[in-house]
Regions:
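Vicinal oxygen chelate
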Residues: 14-20, 78-98
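Conserved acetyl-CoA-binding loop of GNAT-fold acetyltransferases
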Residues: 27-34, 98
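Conserved short beta-strand elements that form part of the metal-binding/catalytic scaffold
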Residues: 32-73
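Short acidic N-proximal helix/loop "leader" segments that mark the beginning
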Residues: 1-5
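N-terminal capping/interface segment
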Residues: 6-8, 14, 42-44
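Eukaryotic phosphotyrosine signaling hubs
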Residues: 8-10, 73-78
Length: 98
């Protein structure tokens, strides 16, 4: 049985415009930086450690988007919160069988 997630946990983006992204998400969502190093930053607007993360491709892949490394800009991944571990597992089993 597939169970709908309870909430969107976080979104991770790959960017070459780190400062602009941090400024924009700070202004629009009231997000604050929880942790930052030269290659990445984690932002939150509530009690979670992070709701947004940004990977700075100008640090990770300074030569550009090599098709072999697939370091393109955009969404890296989404994470979801499920009501329980059992609900997550049941959804996994259901999706795996499709």
């Amino acid at each position: 049985m597939t169970v709908a997630p309870k909430a969107l946990a976080h979104v991770v983006y790959r960017t070459r415009r780190m400062a602009e992204m941090l400024d924009w998400y700070g202004a629009v969502f009231g997000a604050r930086v929880q942790h930052q190093n030269p290659a990445m930053a984690f932002l939150t607007f509530d009690d979670e450690h992070h709701r947004f993360a940004f990977l700075d491709l100008s640090v990770i892949d300074p030569e550009g988007s090599d098709p072999e490394t697939k370091c393109w800009t955009g969404v890296d991944h989404l994470a979801w919160t499920y009501p329980s571990l059992k609900d997550l597992f049941d959804t996994y089993v259901s999706c795996k069988s499709r």
